[in-house]
Amino acid sequence: MDIKRSGSRSSSEGPTEWFTGKVRIEPLFRTSAPGRVQGASVTFEPGARAAWHTHPLGQTLIVMAGRGFVQSWGGPIEAIHPGDVVSCPPGENHWHGATRDSAMTHIAIQEELDGKVVNWMEKVGDDLYRRIRSAKEVDRS
């Protein structure tokens, strides 16, 4: 058994080539081979978001705090709240991040395939993000 104590792992800023705005990533766990699962706590400050990306074996997001948005390529923008669990299937192009007026923290869980857990694409532009209604309005649609 291995216990990783809270606060014992170093966090880092989300790289600007993959994120817009201030993002903090705290690795939580990474299994040893033959396991390939890893997880991190990711906090997006208000207005921060990930670029479009895919995961070769999918991704699960567990929203822990705040309010955010998630969208699959070509799909509607969905509001996400604490307790929501988002399942992104393998290869689904998507993005996620905070609303303009609230930070959002989620736990991200994904598996490695051939040494990769994510394939990054273009950033979610400010023009698209500015057109998003508030989380309350998205919830009502």
Regions found by a protein language model. Give the residues of each.
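A short beta-strand-loop-beta hairpin characteristic of the jelly-roll/cupin
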Residues: 49, 54-82, 92
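Ligand-binding loop in jelly-roll beta-barrel domains
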Residues: 69, 76-77, 81-82, 90-117
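Short, well-ordered turn and helix-capping elements at secondary-structure junctions
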Residues: 7, 27-32, 46-48, 74, ...
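Short glycine/proline-enriched turns and hinge-like loops at secondary-structure junctions
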Residues: 36, 54-56, 98-100
